[in-house]
Amino acid sequence: MAVQSVFRLGLQEKQRAWDRWIAGRLGHRIQVEERRLARRELRRLFGQVVIQVGGTAGFPLIADSLAPVRFHVVFGGDLPKVSHCPIIVAEDNLLPFPTDSVDILVLQHSLDISTHPHQVLREAERVLRPGGRLLLFGFNPTSSWGLRRLLSTPLDSLLPWHARFMRRSQIEDWCRLLNLAPELSRHAVYGLPFAKKGIRRLFKSLEHRMARNEWPVGAVYCLRAKKERNAYIPGKPSPLGRLASVGKTLKPAVGMRRKPVLRVVPKRDGAPPDLTGA
């Protein structure tokens, strides 16, 4: 029997539950559409340092980014031998990056499964540089998937039906309190939350119409926000320079063929995380 809340799980268990769901048909649909949304936004944004928090290791939404510095932060799970960008294992509310050092930060459903979503958003604001952009992906409660979640039982799969579906307006309010100005939002995945193609085919025309007009009833949304603070002081180190010291301390894992898979092990006592090889 599935537990009634994903928030009772540890970080490793959360990551494995997410990875299992993404490997299925429904999860694959979400991953494909969210990568399409991320690609669309990343093409319009410029930045040297792009970080993703959440998602499945080896399948980052930032794979199409041309930024010279990219990291994918996950909570654990099975790390691939080959990845589009270096992978860091860390907590989503304790990111191993300096303050004001990241140009673009992508949160893939981090708030939906975190025990402390407000702390995750606060940490995202900390590492973003003034003028940096946040791309936040979340499950939409005002969708057919949100209705399906309301009808869920303890026998249903853990994700996404026992995760947190947060209203986009609530996230926007949180962002404003943290000097993150919402700029735009996009929606995707208008099909019914069923893996069987026969059932989905009955509503195909309506699905295409909603997708074409981008009605705000898609299963997922992508919120883009800009960090509003004072501009950089002349002579202040660039984000790339600030992350250079981090990159030097990270050691490639043994047996890597192309891109290194790296681990960051946070200290339990609340001190800054140690950077060690996998």
Task: Describe the function of each predicted region.
Residues 36, 41-95:
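Class I SAM-dependent methyltransferase SAM/SAH-binding core
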Residues 93-105:
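A short acidic, Gly/Pro-enriched loop at the edge of an enzyme's catalytic core
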Residues 182-207, 216-217:
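Conserved catalytic loop of SAM-dependent methyltransferase domains
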Residues 1-44:
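Class I SAM-dependent methyltransferase Rossmann-like catalytic core
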Residues 205-278:
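C-terminal lobe and adjacent flexible extensions of AdoMet/dcAdoMet transferase-like proteins
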Residues 118-133:
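A short glycine-rich, Lys/Arg-flanked "PGG" loop and its adjoining helix->strand segment in the class I
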Residues 162-185:
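Short alpha-helix
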Residues 133-162:
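Conserved class I S-adenosyl-L-methionine
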